[in-house]
Amino acid sequence: MEFSLFFFSSCFDSQDDRSSNSYRLLLDAAKFADERGFRAVWTPERHFNPFGGLFPNPSVVSAALAMITSRIRLRAGSVVSPLHHPIRIAEEWAVVDRLSGGRAEFAFASGWHSDDFVFYPERYEDRSAHMYEQIAQVQALWAGQSRKATNGAGREIEIRTYPRPVQNRLPLWITSNGNAETMKSAARLGASVLTNFIGQDAEELAGKIADYRETLESSGFPRGAGRIAVMLHTFVGDDLERVRRIVKAPFIDYLASSLTLLRKLAPNATPGAAPGGIGLEEALRDPAVARKLLDFAFARYWQSAALLGTPDSCGELVRSLEEIGVDEIACLIDFHDDYETVMGGLEGLLRLKERFDPSPAPAAR
């Protein structure tokens, strides 16, 4: 099992959050991971909401990380490709690849929130189809192929993108929140998969991984092709009860910040079942019910869907994920907003990592 770091912190419009200190944890944790054999650093793409709001463009963030790291892979989790022109995706990430000496990777995602699509509103309904078209387009541009485009004078021209990346072949990932067909589609392309436990549990994921591996093989890819990375909220310490005291309040606050997205989406959402059988929109309008939802969510994560605990207690989950075919755990560490606490937790995470992956990260290729 390999381990990487994942970032998705909330930001709020305060004076403190307008300083460079907002990114201090990202930069220092990335250097820690780079020096201690972690596989990658993942950063997301988020727009128009404090939840994940520090990360509107993962290529910019990855370019900064390229300047302070030397070995670790620099990944977007994810690039919401329907919000971009494929030419710009190829150009921006080629810069990251050049700056990092060939360490750029990114996961394509189709997006989900309609507000994000102010860039290309017409793409929202068919966003998944757009994503798969763009995957082929970006792969071709990355490989140095030209593509036709219409210029400002209305003429059709052929363009190639620059700079040329270090890696001849784009390391391809696709993000899935638990959709089995998305994972099979990734397998048909030979793509790796970034997933999570938001819409599935370990038992469900096990079946999807088995189908993914079978589809890879039937699509002509060699055994060992394709990787499965699972994002897990992470804080590892020495004492289980102390860890619980440290993480519970900030974790619930972090989950609460994500509810602002759901509140905006709820009027257009298909009602879901909340504890007690009420609909999603009704639950989010009632603070007491919303709090029960958050407590329910924390209990689920604590028990079986996060690396919250000690190396011993978290090791059980790591072993179970290994058994179902997970290759990498992407550890989301910045749900806690205290710099010293999170950096201290990295030492516990390192001890856990060394039980399963004692080798250093490979040098940049």
What is each of the regions a protein language model found here?
Residues 1-68, 73, 168-170, 347, ...:
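N-terminal beta1-alpha1-beta2 module of alpha/beta enzyme domains
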Residues 3, 37, 45, 65, ...:
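Conserved, mostly hydrophobic/aromatic
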Residues 3-7, 41-43, 74-76, 104-108, ...:
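Hydrophobic faces of well-ordered beta-strands that scaffold small-molecule active sites
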Residues 5, 125-161, 203-326, 359-365:
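An alpha-helical appendage that flanks or caps ligand/catalytic pockets
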Residues 9-23, 79-87, 168-178, 234-237, ...:
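Active-site mouth loops of central-metabolism enzymes
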Residues 20-32, 92, 176-184, 311-320:
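Short, acidic/polar
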Residues 40-61, 80, 112, 198-200, ...:
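Glycine-rich, proline-tolerant flexible connector loops at the mouths of alpha/beta enzymes
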Residues 85-191, 203-219, 223-225:
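Internal, glycine-rich beta/alpha segment that forms the wall or movable "lid"
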